Amino acid sequence: MVASARVQKLVRRYKLAIATALAILLLQGLVVWSFSVLEDDEPGEKGRQKKSRPLDPSEGSKDTDSSAGRRGSAGRRHGRWRGRAESPGVPVAKVVRAVTSRHRTGRRIPPTPPPEAPGRQNLSGAAAEEALVGAAGFPHGDTGSVEGAPQPTDNSFTPKCEIVGKDALSALARASSKQCQQEIANVVCLHQAGSLMPKAVPRHCQRAGKMSPGIPWDEVRAQQPADGPPVRIAYMLVVHGRAIRQLKRLLKAVYHKQHFFYVHVDERSNYLHREVVELARQYDNVRVTPWRMVTIWGGASLLRMYLRSMQDLLEVPGWAWDFFINLSATDYPTRTNEELVAFLSKNRDKNFLKSHGRDNSRFIKKQGLDRLFHECDSHMWRLGERQIPAGIVVDGGSDWFVLTRSFVEYVVYTDDPLVAQLRQFYTYTLLPAESFFHTVLEISPACESLVDNNMRVTTWNRKMGSKSQYKHIVDWCGCSPNDFKPQDFLRLQQTARPTFFARKFEAVVNQEIIGQLDYYLYGNYPAGTPGLRSYWENVYDEPDGIHSLSDVTLTLYHSFSRLGLRRAEASLRAPGESSCRFEPRGLPSSVHLYFYDDHFQGYLVTQAVQSSAQGPAETLEMWLMPQGSLKLLGHSDQASRLQSLEVGQVGTEWDPKERLFRNFGGLLGPLDEPVAMQRWARGPNLTVTVVWIDPTYVVATSYDIVVDAETEVTQYKPPLSRPLRPGAWTVRLLQFWEPLGETRFLVLPLTFNRKLPLRKGKFSQMIAGPPHNEYMEQSFQGLSGILNLPQLEPAEEAARLHAELTGPALEAWTDGEQSSFWSVAGVCAVGPSACPSLELCRLTSWSSLSPDPKSELGPVKADGRLR
């Protein structure tokens, strides 16, 4: 009793404090609860939304020839979206959270009805549902972001129903445009009303069970003549990016005058489109689609592009093809054209597609076929669950196929409800091209023609893993094959199956394997042929315009030009001579990456210049080569494990699948998020401390990495506050505070901001470093004594003065920093030059204008080929 009375007395005395604490806890709980509805349970989803968390290497799985990884987890408590008129100026994400929060507290906001047409009465029940379908544009409305998608008729965002489900709410919160949000809302409302998906699909195939197991390769039968004339092939080349030389090499390898080539270039790849249009003018049987789409990985737009291309190919006068084969620019043949034509001529009634295997339920879950998706804003949004229509025998596994003309005609022109309903189903499906044609064929009258083989060889290195590489464009975990390397060459020569193509090949990753395969098929080039070990890839072309450049690349290319012109001037031996003194004119006209023997050799910058001697305008090309900055400081067994920590090993655009930085040369600006990567030889386990030091000797961060005996690569992106201070940074590796090695990298001092020369003011903060020298919440400056760093004050004063620079003084500082990391390896003249020391670019071995026979297309030879 005494204890009870004492407790009551304490409660009365502190009841205000207790009530306040409980209120705060309740409020925090409500906030966490309301925000959690917008997140996904899956760790990979959180990794996509919180960029500072490294991806879990175990995320995702990959089956042979299938791109989807593990499905997102389900079962989270659903939130709701209740439509309402949006207040002007209120961000959409905040609206979503506010509405969700209000729902949690019990308030109900009814859906906002669509504007009432003049003379039209309000509807309810079935009539209201019918009006909703009509207003949303399905099935008779406008075309949306992808074919068949209901598109809004204005820019207002008004949900026409009460949207239920965490996936739909999350998509609405993350979509960046109101049109996309409205499309998502329309699709979800139709789906909730049961008006979006077909309930059942007719089945015309009388065969039970799965498709044919495949046709083995028979070398003897392959040499026997086929009945009837040789088949003719329509190649559909689906390309994007800037690798025109690799595309030319592919076309050179597969070209024959009896075949037809139709090229679709992604709408975002304007440089490649210009080059392909020019290429197609040389050959009557090569054409470019007069239309272009943005085709994202896993998107419904890819299937739409294929169907439209198929219709085009069927309607080209005089193109009497027998088979449709799709290729990308990263494909390459593994057998000759003669072998392919002979094989298809003996199997002219077969359709070749790769199946996922026997476990249908696992394939459905892994591919997300039981989920509803919609594509808009160049993203595939997961919107909830759905039922697969009755009658469908789901099949698929690869979006690379070889199809007969008769089947293509059936898919494009038929009035069969089977195809129409499957088109509707796959409009809202992830990775539709990996399953649509398989499923149509599996239940169509032509099901007996299906062969389980897509004629491709791919490689999936599970040790390196997919790393959920497409999560920034799809709400799912997926990946693509690894690139082939020289050690894979024997696999490309396999003869057990009739495979005729392999993927993927990337010359910026490894060109040697492309050469090996090319020489194996068509023989070596003559001795002394130039350019066989070189590769060039354009990264900027003048018609792209200044808007295609970032402030970092704009600063860098201008600095490269100035450094190159100083080199040209210094090449003069006669004092006072001005014929080699040039001034740059405008932007560079082009910039290329240059590789030799599969090693990055630097940037080639082509620049229009004016001679100081008042001569005619000229064009020069300058080669800027990166300088190594690795220092191996230790001598222990542990130190010997460190293979490379060199320039380019701190950078951005890290590709964990190929283990390289796609940002070649490590071009970094103050707003970038750099990654440090180390390569290790096998050896004893060790724990390494990594320390980042900025140009003023501020210890920005420190962390430990565990290097197991079998570890080959380690990498980490510390969550540093930005802007980073421009100048030379240092990354040190230590074990027990004894040095193993260090590398330096450059954060480029920007001379441009928003494409304009940097001026004094708030934007000059871009070169002043973070506020209060704080890169992390935790200070690591206490390590400066252990690291024997110089005093901060002199370096900080120099940095303060640099932050005030503009104009030529800022350019001089930028060029000085650049010259510590890049050297001018060569300068040449595109045409005749007044400077006697400049060699013509076409006579050099390194210029982008030097001969490159392996990627040059010429006239068709007597045998109908180019190679």
UniProtKB/Swiss-Prot annotation:
Gene Ontology cellular component list: extracellular space; Golgi membrane
Annotated cofactor note: Active with either Mg(2+) or Mn(2+), but activity is highest when both are present.
Membrane topology field: Single-pass type II membrane protein
Highest rank taxon of the organism: Eukaryota
Compartments reported by the entry: Golgi apparatus membrane; Secreted
Biological or metabolic pathway of the protein: Glycan metabolism; chondroitin sulfate biosynthesis; Glycan metabolism; heparan sulfate biosynthesis
UniProt main location, coarse: Golgi
Functional note: Catalyzes the first step in the biosynthesis of chondroitin sulfate, heparan sulfate and dermatan sulfate proteoglycans, such as DCN. Transfers D-xylose from UDP-D-xylose to specific serine residues of the core protein.
Disulfide bonds: C161-C189, C205-C447, C580-C835, C828-C841
PANTHER family named in the record: XYLOSYLTRANSFERASE 2, XYLOSYLTRANSFERASE OXT
Cofactor: Mg(2+); Mn(2+)
Family per similarity comment: Belongs to the glycosyltransferase 14 family. XylT subfamily.
Record's compositionally biased regions (Basic residues): 73-82
Disordered as annotated region, ranges: 41-122
Biological source species: Bos taurus (Bovine)
Transmembrane segments: 16-36
The protein's name in its UniProt record: Xylosyltransferase 2
